[in-house]
UniProtKB/Swiss-Prot annotation:
One of its GO terms (biological process) is rRNA 5'-end processing. It comes from Onion yellows phytoplasma (strain OY-M). Its main location: cytoplasm. Could be a nuclease involved in processing of the 5'-end of pre-16S rRNA. This is Putative pre-16S rRNA nuclease.
Amino acid sequence: MLKCQNNASLGLDLGEKTLGIALSQTGIIAQNLKTIFFATHKYDRLIAPLQEIIFQYQIKTIVLGYPKHMNNDIGIKAKISSDFKKTLENKFEQVKVILWDERLSTVQAIQMLKTNNKKKGKILQMKDEIAATIILQNYLDYIKLHTNKEH
């Protein structure tokens, strides 16, 4: 079991029946961790496996994908993410939960997997955790850029 520094973060790509999970132990590089499959819209079933991951990796920050429409409108999927954020904050009070614009992250993930010659089944299996990796990496890059400007 890997132990990590105090700036360990998770990236989450929440779908109707999948949760893609990415991890950064250093605050610099995100890597895909896993995809959790669950019954459609049964988001409460994600709490126990997330609790294990949060404890195992000593997670301090969760970056949850926020699926805005391309015109910046907030739809039902964004509302679901917002509600899930509240659930995470209530269950894991010690963890900071951030909503992060995830537009096109799944499209990027699928393109990346196709570029790496992954088969269709593998693409469907991995797209959510790769999307979570993109979400988390975008957040980490943003933090690094804005932290460097302050110093």
